[in-house]
């Protein structure tokens, strides 16, 4: 029996859930903003070029009509493979308007990774930037379902392939009026909007099928002044988060629903980032945790006028309490706004409410959702400050992994609870805290050791720039906690000094008995999430090379 009082439910939504598909809602919102002359949708910070809502709306509608006339419908899928750019969301919106599923592809994937991703999504059309064309051509040779390749970042045809603009011109009738276009209506619970790549942290990435309903719920959260954004004209957001990732995709679609200006970066540059905060009077900045350690120690921040900055939001991977507090202090902010979600939950389902941040917490349960923490062994629902696996339930949860019912059933139980694989607890104020990944826990002589705790301790040392912890296989103990460490430039430490430093702050089971390996870079995914598998591989290789246990 579940204890109802230990199931935490989100509050009533600030706005009711709107009718219609994600495409219909985006079309309605963007058409409204397009009719306000000069309203800017996107700015590319690198080249200082703007594009208005009118221009964006018109091109997205033209693409929708052209794709429809080409023969695409709710039975088809497209891939968008590009770095962050002014054009990225044009085919995304066009497809959503007519019910074609969009499968964003990581533009830095190699051919093998792209082939795996597209084998799952089975796209008919691929939209790609010029620099990714050759990889897509090589994939097409092995995946003949790809009928057409369209170049996103060229006004004219490129190497014999149509650009988006010539594709549109060749398929639209004379006199086509974008403002007369009506998006398609269909069942938003059954029609897939997006197929996102799962993190792949436990194997090859899987295709996460997200119906239109999930995006519609996300839009409700985006409009919410407590869990989302206050809809204030001329709000400017700075984002360096990859658009192909769920974090970047659904935050940006939410910004378009709200009519915000999105200042994008496709590559992080510290001075450009800070100058953009100042020059564009940015109110909210979106970062992945990889960049927080950098800003915690930056000496450049005070050179810029950041008086308009209201918040910095973090997502995509865990952010330690200490690093978050340090960055908030450097930017003169009361705290860092965090969110927690999985690709399989569409977007964040735990969010720091406006004005209610708590250091180290990832937020409270959002509207339409409920969450619980269960005992790892018995599955019993736990109470306040008790650690177990976080489970969530609500209407943004995926419909399933594409063509993989076994993996779907392993993640979502018969009652609709998604088992996150994250160790968490909630406090007396119903703030949730993520402790570690269930599969990342190190099993030392029967004790469970959380790598995140040791990583946080390591990052507090002034000589350590970055660190990752994993379990080193051991015949006697099961696993030994071990670390990879990047030292601050110009600083020196011995392995023993680091081991002794950690030992002085932890119980005996948590000591770094597997030792320390010095590296130039800690392996991480694109959003800053530590790659435990690669860290473990480095540690095992170092041990085979003669490294002794401590």
UniProtKB/Swiss-Prot annotation:
> Which reaction(s) does its UniProt entry say it catalyses?
firefly D-luciferin + ATP + O2 = firefly oxyluciferin + hnu + AMP + CO2 + diphosphate
**Can you name one GO molecular function term for this protein?**
Photinus-luciferin 4-monooxygenase (ATP-hydrolyzing) activity
Subcellular location, in the record's words?
Answer: Peroxisome
Q: Which Pfam family would be a valid example here?
A: AMP-binding
Matches recorded under SUPFAM superfamilies: Acetyl-CoA synthetase-like
Task: Give GO cellular component annotations, separated by semicolons.
Answer: peroxisome
Broad enzyme group: oxidoreductase
What's the domain of life for this entry?
A: Eukaryota
Which cofactors does this protein require?
A: Mg(2+)
A single Gene Ontology biological process assigned to it is:
bioluminescence
Q: What is its EC number?
A: 1.13.12.7
Keyword annotations: ATP-binding, Luminescence, Magnesium, Metal-binding, Monooxygenase, Nucleotide-binding, Oxidoreductase, Peroxisome, Photoprotein
The record's InterPro entries line, in alphabetical order, gives: AMP-bd_C (IPR025110), AMP-bd_C_sf (IPR045851), AMP-binding_CS (IPR020845), AMP-dep_synth/lig_dom (IPR000873)
Q: Where is this motif: Microbody targeting signal?
A: 548-550
What is known about what this protein does? Produces green light with a wavelength of 562 nm.
Q: Which family does it belong to?
A: Belongs to the ATP-dependent AMP-binding enzyme family.
Please give the name of this protein.
Luciferin 4-monooxygenase
